[in-house]
Amino acid sequence: MAQTHSFNGRKRVRKFFGKIPEVAEMPNLIEVQKASYDQFLMVEEPSGGRSDEGLQAVFKSVFPIQDFSGASMLEFVRYEFDAPKFDVDECRQRDLTYSAPLKVTLRLIVFDIDEDTGAKSIKDIKEQDVYMGDMPLMTDNGTFIVNGTERVIVSQMHRSPGVFFDHDKGKTHSSGKLLFAARVIPYRGSWLDIEFDSKDIVYARIDRRRKLPATTLLMALGMDGEDILSTFYKTVTYTRDGDNWRIPYSADRFKGMKIISDLIDADTGEVVLEAGKKLTARSAKQLAEKGLKAIKATEDDLFGSYLAEDVVNYATGEIYLEAGDEIDEKVLKTLIDTGETEINVLDIDHINIGGYIRNTLAVDKNESRQEALFDIYRVMRPGEPPTMDSAEAMFNSLFFDAERYDLSAVGRVKMNMRLDLDAEDTVRVLRKEDILAVVKMLVELRDGRGEIDDIDNLGNRRVRSVGELMENQYRVGLLRMERAIKERMSSIEIDTVMPQDLINAKPAAAAVREFFGSSQLSQFMDQTNPLSEITHKRRLSALGPGGLTRERAGFEVRDVHPTHYGRICPIETPEGPNIGLINSLATFARVNKYGFIESPYRKVVDGKVTNDVVYLSAMEEAKHSVAQANVELDERGGFVDEFVICRHAGEVMMAPRENVDLMDVSPKQLVSVAAALIPFLENDDANRALMGSNMQRQAVPLVRAEAPFVGTGMEAVVARDSGAAIAARRGGVVDQVDATRIVIRATEDLDPSKSGVDIYRLMKFQRSNQNTCINQRPLVRVGDPIQKGDIIADGPSTDLGDLALGRNVLVAFMPWNGYNYEDSILLSEKIVSDDVFTSIHIEEFEVAARDTKLGPEEITRDIPNVSEEALKNLDEAGIVYIGAEVHPGDILVGKITPKGESPMTPEEKLLRAIFGEKASDVRDTSMRMPPGTYGTVVEVRVFNRHGVEKDERAMAIEREEIERLAKDRDDEQAILDRNVYGRLADMIDGKVAAAGPKGFKKGSTITRELMTEYPRSQWWQFAVDDEKLQGELEALRGQYDESKKLLEARFMDKVEKVQRGDEMPPGVMKMVKVFVAVKRKIQPGDKMAGRHGNKGVVSRILPVEDMPFLEDGTHADIVLNPLGVPSRMNVGQILETHLGWACAGMGKKIGELIDVYRKTANIEPLRDTLEHIYPDNDRNEPVRSYDDDSVLMLANQVKRGVSIATPVFDGAVEADINAMLTDAGLATSGQSTLYDGRTGEPFDRQVTMGYIYMLKLHHLVDDKIHARSIGPYSLVTQQPLGGKAQFGGQRFGEMEVWALEAYGAAYTLQEMLTVKSDDVAGRTKVYEAIVRGDDTFEAGIPESFNVLVKEMRSLGLNVELDDTRDEQQQALPDAAE
């Protein structure tokens, strides 16, 4: 028999429906973050020193720093990181930032300057390590721990540096004329705009300031008028020929022109072309071939053209005419009078070549470089008088000084590509050639040649990831520091100082802290489930510093662009104001060194698709024709069809197969991770797919995770890359397992310097950022062999290494008494009782005892005026026990605060004298459970300031922690001993001893039996004659001692950290954190959703017996409204239902076969069925070669339902679903007869029924529902606050007032607006009246009315209220009169 495979049952086996083979490996999903930050920090210094990027580049750009006189200089040598003080977990617990100290080696050089010659000689060199603050480190999962919370730095999309050509789309001028503009955007520095106005004059702007003629800029670059014209225009020479003139003929110049007068050969005088004809390119070429050299021109032809050069009288130096002057009769006469026989004019025909630059030169008032520089200076620094030096220095610093202006390598590359230049990418400033090339290109565009740029093309937008954002931020900090250093170098006695004395690292550290703490791009990580983590790390935002703002971003920026294909997901983006501004990276995309997003393609060579994969950016892709991944191929890899659908330069077209040179690697390369998790995505409407991918990120991890029957094959990738499921770091054998850790004895890559033991600590019931529960469960048993990369533990929302966001539930599509009207969801009570959608949420409560002015607060069980019943859950230190069940209002931590002394009444004095009671000096400020939350205390942490005595509880927690550490150390020591002594025994077994322990005969043979007579620690005393072996023994002993020492040192260090006091905010003496776990069952009002954007709210939970049921008595779990499908066009859910039904049917069939096996011990029927389900191909498990145990294990895994994978755009089709339904023995319609649970009658029509994967979303009714009777009021308006967080009340708003007005309910309305709302005096009066038993009251003036009056007064309107009641009563005449 062929080689047998065994199945360990630790992974979910899926039947793959995909037909397209996976050619490229999907890149690690959080590579974007990790690679970027690693490249920035470069923690390990490579052997040849670090390259100039990241942190190294920042230091290199700021150092060396010279003082103002040049007498000393501070140089940067290198930097290095020390080990972080606390590891990730300790930082999380103690609210610290996970970071490593940065040490920089600086060299201070002091010069002697010769006063006469000014020559420098080195007088002194000092080198020193300087501490430069802490640098946050990234965790293995691509996040940062800042002040104890996990944060993510989102990558930013921004406009790439370089040059962009654009026009105003005809919006500026009323005629709709296109005004072209060019903009040079550097990475940092001044922007340069060059633009046309409506009169076709070219202007330049620097930093969006007042515009200057572009020729002013060119003159400032050192050109004069003649240079400028000769750069932009060719010349035509008119030569005097008797009375007429002749001009040279060139085919290029004349082609396409309409001839106004006859074209006459100047040499022969014959007419070569009559007037009124058009000279085509072909006929123009023919004339040149026939030998036409020059043609006749008249004076009329000269009029209106422009001189190409100055006309000068060389004898006197007088300039008669200047270059660019228009030729008219007067000018021509002057020319003829000076005896000129040749006139050079500019080649401007106003059709193909416009005279824009010449016209600009004519408008420009500046004549010389100095005037031009002064003009620019006045624009940039208005109000300052310019001098030549200051103007020149300012102009140079704008574009030509590397300190102030940086195009960056990207900018230079883009500029070279756009303008066909060939500058090195180390030239990061502008050159004269660049500016000229930009103006030339702009004029070409105006003349109708060339294309404008599309700024939404991904070739013109780039991604700034963590590393680069951090680099910019750190540079800002260093530049602030540089100023301080320069000042200090000048003011201090430089000979006596060390580099340490010059440097104050605070600005650099502050810049880093500010970036991680308050930057728009540093975000609190969305940790609801593993998918939301991964999506957050792969997010691209166009917002943030230097980016767009929501209000200003138009439709174009938000829209999907053809270049997004395979780079940015067209589906996943938020609904609402941020739509299209926040995107997600596609599954296979990666970011290249220039920050452009690349997508992988397979090469097509000679019509054959190869497996070579190339990554291309949007700019490079535009040159190729790219076929889609699902194009049909024959077995040799050639295209089957003559014409293939492909993409070329943003257009989709049919191309002959010979022209195709690339092909997509995978159909899912165009969508993001979340969208790739939706099966049958191809059958869903885009809007619903968007909701589906967004709602998966809100799914709450359930108590019992279950992977979907109908998956897409991406589930395992997400679980692994997100770090939720734990993968083995190297191969080995499981040594110990319990709920909190897995110990693996390594058998692969055993490095002598590393321990031979891997200990994996599992997270137990930890709180996530979103209060969901993070809990990991081991999947392995003692003795299991482990391969590198195997999943050894499941995390939150993972099931056997597959992402499991929800549960498979049996759904019937039918209306049920209006309970599923408008997307409501009807649930069965069974779902609640079986805890199908039960989740655990962990709330954190924190209480701090501070040192107040009146004395310290105290955490204690001794609280005034509180019954013993209320203290039942507290220990002697006043802190709640672990495991206590707590209800709203229960005390979690008892705390008393000293009260200020108030003057005592005589009675109080008497009582105080009698009882000597001092208890009234404190008030109860205990931490209590907030309203509406019930739960169980799962963890308590106590933090003490240094030097504050620890209470009992803190000591107990500390002891527990130290015991855990000791156990870890002992286990690792035991495995080390086993490993080392085992190797030692193998090495000396059967060898002749040259020496041994006491009582051992020298020269006898060492055997294992003999060795067991001595304690293991004495085995090292055996020695052998073989020198090589003896050397190995000694090396092993050295290694063993070293490992032992390292273990002990690590243990002592951890213990010291546990015993040491904690860093506390100022004024805090002691802090207690209590974690309460809340079990949330599903209930009416909770939001649920499928993966296809089909969301709804639970409306009612029905008793099981009332739910519709099948013939065999199976009740539906959920009833959904069929009307939710047609208008939403998310048919994917129906296909999923049918396929899920087939999966469950197959599972049931396998369950029956397992029963057969148990009775008959014949496994063949089971094996045959499984082989039929998982046919042999490269994507399925090799079930054919499984041994019997593996077959049984697999069968047990799939008996609830066979798991399948239907990848997006390459999934199961109708025929596949039909085939699977048939195999399971079910109707291919996918419908069944259902019976009403209440009456037992069958329903009239058959009902679609099947399994859908449903999620419970993080919009739970418990978090939203809220009640208040009395609570806080707003200070100003005296109205209740709003919202659950503020414990707010209801507001009788504007519309409600209208309702009462409409009813004319005047008294009710008066009550609402006064005593029931914010009439303070009235409120108290009503209370008093009720106490008296009186039911009359009088309304006063509401506080909000007073606010209105005050606001009007603040506007300067004096509003006074006159009480006119008495006067009116007097004025009324008596009725009797």
Curated annotation (Swiss-Prot):
Keywords: DNA-directed RNA polymerase, Nucleotidyltransferase, Transcription, Transferase. GO terms for cellular component: DNA-directed RNA polymerase complex. GO terms for biological process: DNA-templated transcription. Gene3D superfamilies: 2.40.50.100, 2.40.50.150, 3.90.1100.10, DNA-directed RNA polymerase, beta subunit, external 1 domain, DNA-directed RNA polymerase, subunit 2, domain 6, RNA polymerase alpha subunit dimerisation domain, RNA polymerase Rpb2, domain 2. This is DNA-directed RNA polymerase subunit beta. One of its GO terms (molecular function) is ribonucleoside binding. Belongs to the RNA polymerase beta chain family. It catalyses: RNA(n) + a ribonucleoside 5'-triphosphate = RNA(n+1) + diphosphate. The keyword Transferase applies. DNA-dependent RNA polymerase catalyzes the transcription of DNA into RNA using the four ribonucleoside triphosphates as substrates. It comes from Brucella anthropi (strain ATCC 49188 / DSM 6882 / CCUG 24695 / JCM 21032 / LMG 3331 / NBRC 15819 / NCTC 12168 / Alc 37) (Ochrobactrum anthropi). The RNAP catalytic core consists of 2 alpha, 1 beta, 1 beta' and 1 omega subunit. When a sigma factor is associated with the core the holoenzyme is formed, which can initiate transcription. It is an enzyme of class 2 (transferase). Its EC number is 2.7.7.6.
